Amino acid sequence: MRKGILLKTAALAMAVVMTFSCSIIAFASEDVDYTINNPYSGVDFGNWDQYKADLHCHTTASDGDVDMDVMIEEHYTQGYDVLALTDHGITSKGWTTVSSRNYFKIALSIADGKLRQITPLTEQRYNEITTGVGRNGRGMIEVPLGIEQNPTSLNNAHVNSWCTEYGDGVVGGTSNYDEVIRNVDETGGLSVINHPGEYTKAKEESCQADAYDESDSWYDYVINKFANILINYESCIGIDINSKKDGRTKYDRKLWDILLQKVIPTGRNVFAIATTDAHQLDKVGCAWTDLCMPENTAENVRACLQNGSFFAVSRYIKNSEELAQFSLETGIDWGTEFEQENRDGSIPAPKATNVIVNETDDTITLNVDHALTVHWIADGKVIAVGNTIDLDDFSDEIGSYVRAEAFGHGGVLYTQAFTLDYDGAPESNVKTTFDFGNILAELKHFIIEVCTSIPLGKEVYDFLVKPVTE
């Protein structure tokens, strides 16, 4: 009881301080002529729908514990509208077709102690799911040609891609982002950098201050490495900021803010998604991406991902400092880890209902259901609390963007960044880097060339990477 009183007192104090601070800022800040670039400007919130998408999950075709048909069915049961099967090194050829490779099936069958089964949907069940049988006609569709690239990476340098067959059966990938993202770009696909906290090892830090500390040579390298990739390849839409149950991505919102500061001044945005990365059924439902579209089609999914007209949503937060901020704003102690295990819809996650940008008044409003608080972030810092932000009140704290987070009993929602053009806007400070993964890629190509040149080497290699079709 005493703890609750203290928290409520702290919340009230914070509200008073922020109100007082805002009045000072409003007096001191300049009236800047902002051009607000709204990623939701083309969305008709009154007539369009938002479609719940899982852009990253696995099946027994690679290292998932769940058979293909069961994974699809679980997503359908939990109300997903869009699903991408993104097995390691295996391009999904559709829900009624087996897609795998011999090396995966052999290795994982040995690990399982039995032959690994891959069961696609029947044509009848496929038609039922895509037409919404049992869901009042609300079907679930597939994102075409999903795959998680770099399947044999030794340091989790993983990249998701869709809408291209590139990567099917391609091995390797340790530290190598540039080659795979370049090839996805050149073959007309889209990509995203998956759970960067695994590759960067930021997930192992004990506090946010140490994660992605640019004074650390390793973090400085990977930050600028990612920034250069995003600048060079616009088909790489951004990064995964909250996946699975957030244990490995808990500091990747900080990375996102750093990348936004570096990349936006070059003329492009960096979008953020949330995914399940489900290998087991208990991960389904932990996160998703709400796609704003007039109709649920593969063409609209692609356009939505390219335009950034979507919201990332998760039921998990493992960043204690973020939760401390939400505790102050709501007067509720959320502890150091937030986990909303409810899956029946009785505790809904925050849902955006409208985004309103007023260029004349330099204001942005996020209308959202099922949220206890909304706050606005600029350059990685919370600068305002409430559904509406007046940019002129915070002009001395704003750089090249603002973004919003909405939090409630059901989880957290992240908007995309609203990029800002104005006189005196920050300039880019991206350092030129070399992707040392390219050296490892060349070494991989050399080893494959040598191995396939010896007697029976090519036959063995071709067999291992041969597609499994049944």
What are the language-model segments listed below?
Residues 6-17:
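Sec-dependent N-terminal signal peptides
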Residues 19-33:
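Sec-dependent signal peptide cleavage junction
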Residues 29-33, 37-46, 71, 266-272, ...:
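C-terminal functional module detector
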Residues 32-210, 234, 240-256, 270, ...:
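A metal-dependent hydrolase metal-coordination microenvironment
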Residues 468-470:
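Short, solvent-exposed mixed-charge patches
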